[in-house]
């Protein structure tokens, strides 16, 4: 037993144990060189993680990005998302991160979850409402477990009309008006009957044009509208009405004439509608006591202005001097049936009204039914005779667009009956914007009594509205 104790004792001797302890302590001490290397290694770590997508930062970007929101709204179409109630409109779906990928099929932009939102046709209305409520709940709860959309949806002011901020409403309105003026006579023609249904009168348009003029003066410090793309009053009236109803454009030279709604993402090609009557306003407005017939207003055309879709079919008109257009008349309206057939049997050439038709011209000059025509650059024999309707600035919006729906008020369930009654009188979005603009114009008029230019412009606006009304009545009663 003693031998075994002696064999073990050298391992635990005091001479050996302190050396081991000293080595262990030295291993735990970091020298200056090693510490600098460690600091360099820790500094490199954030650079290596730069490519890593933080879910929290990604969620804050998605839920606060207005462009991403309207990108999801644009994915909804009438073919893939039809027959849905207002509670399931694309604005509400995009609010919670959903995009429309197939018919009645939604996909989350973050967690890639899918949601089938089909509504089966049922005769029981209570079951239909129950299904709608289930889909409303699914918009929030159908995401994956750690998806951020249920807790941080997009704010409502992304698409709401900020009627409580007059300065924002006015600046947006003037911006849309300025953009639309670039289309000039390519702007669509608006039916006078639609303006009557909207309760838009000549006086209303005059006030809005006055407000636009004052706003441009305050921004640029100019006394005229030289910064606008067009100085035509008829163009200004049409652009004013379209801007009031929420339409704008990103038109550039050489591009197609398309107007769009920034709220419902609706895009409309203006070549499918009747464009503005090509009337030379300087001549038509110079004689206020001279009545203008609808047919004459339809035939007028300003020199040097032609819409792009007419340049293709009427490119040959540039070969002829405008002076030759004075003698051009529509003889089919004034001739007998036999003479009319004889004229139609001959080919229509550029020399009509001259040469062999000189006798016909003399007869027309002596006819008491002859009406004086203004010079036209467009040939009456053009094949561009496809029927085009007028543009309705309200019905062209999508049914769920905020511009054509009642503005949503805040919850008033705990408030008094008077406030609830006032909230129930909320009007359509475009009407709320109109009230804000008129109130702003009224306040400026009271503060600035110098309104000498208003009667002149108002008189011209009244005349253009009368021309539109006469043209509408003539088309209804040919």
UniProtKB/Swiss-Prot annotation:
Zinc-finger keyword on record: yes
Zinc finger motifs (C3HC-type), residue ranges: 93-147
Full protein name: Zinc finger C3HC-type protein 1-like
Key word Ion transport present: no
The species this protein was found in: Xenopus tropicalis
PTM field: Phosphorylated. May also be weakly phosphorylated on Tyr residues.
Residue stretches of biased makeup (Polar residues): 351-363
Compositionally biased tracts (Low complexity): 377-388
